[in-house]
Amino acid sequence: MTDVTLKALAAERQVSVDRLVQQFADAGIRKSADDSVSAQEKQTLLAHLNREAVSGPDKLTLQRKTRSTLNIPGTGGKSKSVQIEVRKKRTFVKRDPQEAERLAAEEQAQREAEEQARREAEEQAKREAQQKAEREAAEQAKREAAEKAKREAAEKDKVSNQQTDDMTKTAQAEKARRENEAAELKRKAEEEARRKLEEEARRVAEEARRMAEENKWTATPEPVEDTSDYHVTTSQHARQAEDENDREVEGGRGRGRNAKAARPAKKGKHAESKADREEARAAVRGGKGGKRKGSSLQQGFQKPAQAVNRDVVIGETITVGELANKMAVKGSQVIKAMMKLGAMATINQVIDQETAQLVAEEMGHKVILRRENELEEAVMSDRDTGAAAEPRAPVVTIMGHVDHGKTSLLDYIRSTKVASGEAGGITQHIGAYHVETDNGMITFLDTPGHAAFTSMRARGAQATDIVVLVVAADDGVMPQTIEAIQHAKAAGVPVVVAVNKIDKPEADPDRVKNELSQYGILPEEWGGESQFVHVSAKAGTGIDELLDAILLQAEVLELKAVRKGMASGAVIESFLDKGRGPVATVLVREGTLHKGDIVLCGFEYGRVRAMRNELGQEVLEAGPSIPVEILGLSGVPAAGDEVTVVRDEKKAREVALYRQGKFREVKLARQQKSKLENMFANMTEGEVHEVNIVLKADVQGSVEAISDSLLKLSTDEVKVKIIGSGVGGITETDATLAAASNAILVGFNVRADASARKVIESESLDLRYYSVIYNLIDEVKAAMSGMLSPELKQQIIGLAEVRDVFKSPKFGAIAGCMVTEGTIKRHNPIRVLRDNVVIYEGELESLRRFKDDVNEVRNGMECGIGVKNYNDVRVGDMIEVFEIIEIQRTIA
């Protein structure tokens, strides 16, 4: 028999290599997968396996089942039989010889310890008894000597003072009695201590003996509990309870009539009682054809005194009913606990993991959070990455305020004209470019500066190594400049400041330094860490110094990445191309991305069918810090998602589908959560006007930025609702959705196709195209302003002073007035002021001048005024006439 490798032997035996290695280890032979196995080693392994096969089982389980019948009296004198089945199961574990020897040694040591403790206790008791006897003898001698001296003294003083002698004797007797009592108590305490010591030693020995007997290998099953006496015992308990109840009732009746004390109940199993007599009489009646029985049963279950704390396993989402089942409580208790925490839910509602954890911990249970992404972790861990890290190019993000010259600066570096291609001259999505310089390669990310693109700038700061903060020398620090500083600090990346537009006459770079120093950006000449470079994107001055500063900062950072192996990176931007499908701009962080790789990207997956660089040229691979556009994904990924190359497309699809389902569950759980503080907002929701919008844009980042900006415009009276959003042109489905929801169709750098235009014309939908985000936001603001209810404002048009008061049978009190300001008009609302305090507000009913009804009276003229439903007009009052005007409100 020739030697074979362990792998070949495993294949021959049809077992795994790891299993065979373990079997060799159990047989005392250490082998690895590539080692050879000799014939002698095979014989050793075979003998070991045979020994394991013939050895008896390690466990022996005995099961016993007993059945009995219990008769229970029912209503109407009828009884019913209940079948009772008692199942018992006992498992005996076989001990190995070493374990048996160890237990025997422990038992022997326990017996020796017990014997030693008993001997020590006896010796201690003897010593204490001897010491006690000696103390008692000494005390007895002292007492006898004292008594003798007292007797002699008493005989001498007996004649002189009999009364004093009696008192002395009494005191001495009392003292002797107390001493005797103290000695007796001490003796009892010593005996009690000795008795406790012996009992403790005996208890320890008994416990050790019992444990040794339980651990022995024995096939004797435990005795089956005899249930034949069950009915007798139950009936006896019931009779005792009934007798006790009768005694309490009779004792309560007899308290007010000097009743005799109740006699104690008879002890013993066969004690006669009222229940026994009634049961005997019932048996006699039953023999004569009666159907009643006097026996009764009593339930012996007692409610647990304290709550049971359980380990509750909670997944990422769980319903209220499932959570209640895991805690073994009713669903109403869980709902009550959630209401105490401020959340309302139904029993079938899905809640998120954090809420379920709070509820379970509030109810006193221990929470175990279960991770449901084992498959995802397995796919991510099964990646082949190289070990050696090599230097890589820095990723530089250009940030700053809008119109401060970021894209123009990058244009000069790339010697291209990208800014002219941007709508309105402003950047509206991230551009990724890499340029070759004399000192090395640099990858640039150009971010938008408009306020709406906050999330884009945050993404750019997270994916970058160095931030170039562009500040216009004539404009200074602006809001988006401050925001860019905050993003850079949050991402923990160094900042290089490029002071742009230095060629302008009004440029003031020192002011820029002073303003930036207030936000923690200090130049190196002031003792800070940030490099300041004066540049001009138009003239090209300072560009070389800026590139040198970037490369110097990158050299300080010592940027390295693994160049070989499976790639990983981040999505910078994504969009839907009509001819190519979903397109994602990916920045590779480590590894090398090849054409044909299987990538997992957020909720999407796919095989890389094509790769293009920023110039639109086809490339076959992309290393670290290289931005590329990839085609072949199953859908448009979200900007900011992680891109990972995996081995298996099937597993990638499973992970993507799992992520989609998990995202949907968590989203539903958060949507359904309705807290108490939002209850009144939900009640008044029907009174709020809504502007429904269906949004389509060219890239994912623009959709995200526009959605955030529009949702921030919502007020308490008018809310913006994004009914649907997506990347790509406006389709027939989008138009149908807008028609069904009465929404406005908004296209940002996209157009509607022919089928969508037909639906838009037939349904008369409002379709708007935009290429600049400013115009879109302004028009939505105008539409929302039209839905606002107008503001009502009171404007005083006249003031009259009461000079005299007349009585009219038709109108009551008529005020004779002089108009002091403005004009008094009929049927306008008025206020009556007395000492500049409003005492009545109503309507002007009658206005006359020289007994003629007039519509208005001008300043400086007299008139008679009748106030509707008011007669308490006095001389000196002022009558103020006003009108209510409406002012159209706008959204700021």
From Swiss-Prot:
One cellular component term from this protein's GO annotations in UniProt: cytoplasm
Composition-biased stretches (Basic and acidic residues): 93-159, 166-216, 270-282
Region (G2): 425-429
Residue sites binding GTP per the record: 400-407, 446-450, 500-503
Region (G5): 536-538
InterPro entries recorded: DNA-bd_dom_put_sf (IPR009061), EF-G-like_DII (IPR053905), EFTu-like_2 (IPR004161), IF2_assoc_dom_bac (IPR013575), IF2_II (IPR044145), IF2_N (IPR006847), P-loop_NTPase (IPR027417), Small_GTP-bd (IPR005225)
Region (G3): 446-449
MF (Gene Ontology): GTP binding; GTPase activity; guanosine tetraphosphate binding; translation initiation factor activity
Disordered: annotated segments: 88-305
Alphabetized UniProt keyword annotations: Cytoplasm, GTP-binding, Initiation factor, Nucleotide-binding, Protein biosynthesis
Composition skew (Basic residues), residue ranges: 254-269
Disulphide-bridged cysteine pairs: none
Superkingdom of the organism of origin: Bacteria
GO BP, one annotated term: translational initiation
Pfam families assigned: EF-G_D2, GTP_EFTU, GTP_EFTU_D2, IF-2, IF2_assoc, IF2_N
Region described as G1: spans on this chain: 400-407
Localization annotation: Cytoplasm
Known function: One of the essential components for the initiation of protein synthesis. Protects formylmethionyl-tRNA from spontaneous hydrolysis and promotes its binding to the 30S ribosomal subunits. Also involved in the hydrolysis of GTP during the formation of the 70S ribosomal complex.
Membership in a protein family: Belongs to the TRAFAC class translation factor GTPase superfamily. Classic translation factor GTPase family. IF-2 subfamily.
The name this protein goes by in its record: Translation initiation factor IF-2
Gene name in the database record: infB
